[in-house]
Amino acid sequence: MNEEYVIQMKGIRKIYPNGVVANQDVDLNVRKGEIHALMGENGAGKSTLMKMLFGLEQPTEGEIYVNGEKVHLSSPNVAISKGIGMVHQHFLLVPSLTVAENIVLGMTPKKNGIFIDRQKAIKITEEYSKKFNLAVDPNARVVDIPVGMKQKVEILKALVRGAKILILDEPTAVLTTQETTELFKELKHLKEQGYTLIFISHKLNEIMEITDRLSILRGGKFMGVYETKDVTPEKISRLMVGRDVVLQVQKDVAKPTDEILRVRDLHYVNDWGKKMLNGVSLSVRKGEILGIAGVEGNGQKELVDMLFGLNKPNEGTITMKGDNIIGLNQRQLREKHISLVPEDRMLFGIAANASIEENIISDRADSKKMNKGLMFNMKNMHEETDALIKEYKVLCKSRDQKVGMLSGGNIQKVVVAREFSNQPDLIIADQPTRGIDVGATEFIRKKLVELSRSGIGVLLVSADLNEVMELSDSLIVMYGGQIVAYFEDTSQLNDEIMGQYMLGIKKQTAEEIARVCHE
């Protein structure tokens, strides 16, 4: 095989038992010491291809070579033994353990063969941290560290196990602009030391900045490999989706009217005794998108959980059109015409083993339209499901296909098809485009703007700073469980201004922040 490449995947085909073809004769050639992007829409076959490279799945056909040697990667342990490591999008860390304990987990050093040698674990962590310029606190509990440090812990875990080839799955999905900049410096340092990085991302600006070459998949097929410097973001988008993509949403000036959601003086202490919300107050009005920005872990999740009915505050009030909604369950919230797009679509957004139709109709199955006497009106159910599949461009075999068999982007389209189509007065959208491709992102962003301009109130929570600045009509920033800034006009904002508030460097006066209550 060609010694230029540390990874060669040749003629890879993956067909699942249900007949779904995830990869069709895909070739992937990765050079030593390069940062190589793997791109494609959700459902294009990227994840499947990387699962095979990391030994999580087996190809139906094809060959894999690592450093010129033909290999059978029957498990992650085999892949690790060949110098391959994977940093997953959703971190696989134990929150209650320290950074050092997480890094050596599974290969924990022992004293006298019995007791955990914590000092040695700390020493290993410090040694690798220094060697690779990945600054972490070995003694900190993972539950208490910021997201950016968790990312470094995951990378160190792979490096400690001898990885020379790192697969990075959406590594910046939950990072701030500053954390992303820092991560890129660290990745370039790894590259300079001869490490090879496979970088999976939907963020075209990052691909252009950090990668040397890129391979593109579409519909499970290999569309080509390119030198990054020779292509434009527009060309990449066309190769990924087969058409031009416009991520910058055109929107009219918002004309908000009545207050629809009122949150006042929310306080919440979590099970570890940490104060996660400290006097949060805000209002959402009809016809506007109110965005919430901030580094994850600063109270956004706790706030959204309360609005979703998953938790209750220790103090404070939440009302919808004047009615208290604290303590209401999901069904009762829907009766208040609140639609919910959860951050974790797999856990809270769908029933994976149910069909597309069952998932889409689940919130309206007891409506008059969907019932005929004591029986379901199957004709109306089929028609509504098919219409939404068409409108929201859900790529599927049929309405009867299990949702769990769809790609991430198409699962998200099923969620938003249900939530956006049920005549809501308020949409709470938590990370609505996280981990989905540019085509699905474009569609969902346009829909949110379209719905807000029809008079619906939208509360948008997003870790994607560009997204939250572009879509929001007004914007709050959360830090340390508090609102530290409110911007009534987002047109003059930039990453640098936002970053200062998101990292707690700056805070507006109480009077400036109070404007978000519109009283």
Where are these regions (language model features)?
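Glycine-rich phosphate-binding loops of nucleotide-dependent enzymes
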Residues: 2-519
